[in-house]
Amino acid sequence: MLKQSKVSWVRGFVNIPNLFLQNENGKIVGVKENAIRTHIPTLKFIQAKKALGDRVKFILSLKIPFELYTDTVPKVGTKEMEYIFQATEVLLKTYDMAKNIEILVMGNEPEWENALDTDLCHADGEDYRAFLNEFANRLTAWKQANGWTFDIYAGALNRVSELPKSETVPAVVSVVNNNPNVVGLDLHVHALKINQAEDDFRIIRDKYGVTKKLICTEFSMVRALNPHVADALGEWGTKHGYTAGMKIYEYLNLIAEKANAGTPVSATEFKSLFESYSWYPKNWYKTFYEVFKKYDTYAITGRFSVVPGGARAVYDAKTEMWELGGIYFSRYLG
């Protein structure tokens, strides 16, 4: 499917601490080098790149959630910090990862992963700033030593417009603005209201003065969809051969079964269900697209396809509707 599409960017995502670091009593105590070198998703990522060739560029996002550890962000120069860098370097050398990526993103939504309290305002901002600066400098040294050419981005900041008091956001932005080794900033825009598609970009450019490149490796309206997963089909259901009391998640389970059996519902029916609800953000993909163009977004990645037998085999009233953000809906429409 990727070969037949016009996709130009593919993003990979790896959680460094969960997969590749040893953790004892809230401390990073070592690196699982064998786990890195035998990590099957890494191999598949590289195989996909080689199959697609130069036509498609790959992005690697490194998730480093410090909230897993009691001391949040380790100090630069400590053994804990060095283990993080060691694991990253081994990963980049495994299967020639570094030679096959165009962009490396340091971090993933650090507002959530570096918070000291539940209001997401207070964080170990200065230590996180120091970490990112050191990380960018280490990556640059490795690039020079190994002939690697990927660009370094910081991020990925999420809900910037909703967290005006965050200590993490200005820390990340300062690294982007002041470290010459950092090419740009990654934004994740998971909007609750459609106007928020632009809010984060505008604030980053206007309030924080970021002039470097922007990319967006995640975007969705999942937060607008989740509260309605158990809504009834209502009059639409009656008109289309279902019961008025059937829930959206029940409908999704049913049409997934139909698609799997080779008798999928039509795309017209599928689309008309959501457009029958006043809460549904109509044309949200188009809205995001216009925002990306307006802010000259260098690279955008999102959910490409929803395939049968995905991570959420059966939906229920608590299922988060990430899969409704795909471009193709093989799971629902065959």
What do these predicted regions represent?
Residues 114-124, 184-192, 271-276:
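Surface-exposed cleft-lining segments at the edges of enzyme active sites
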Residues 10-14, 58-64, 91, 98-102, ...:
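Aromatic- and acid-rich polysaccharide-binding/catalytic face
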Residues 5-159:
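Substrate-binding cleft and catalytic face of glycoside hydrolase catalytic domains
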Residues 156-186, 196, 200, 225-234, ...:
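Substrate-binding cleft/loops of secretory-pathway carbohydrate-active enzymes
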Residues 103-108, 129-170, 182-187, 212-223, ...:
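Aromatic-lined carbohydrate-recognition surfaces of secreted/lumenal glycan-active proteins
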Residues 2-7, 291:
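A short, Lys/Arg-enriched amphipathic alpha-helix followed by its capping loop at the start of a domain
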Residues 192, 219-334:
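Substrate-binding cleft of secreted/luminal carbohydrate-active enzymes
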Residues 1, 37-46, 86-92, 158-175, ...:
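Alpha-helical scaffolding within the catalytic cores
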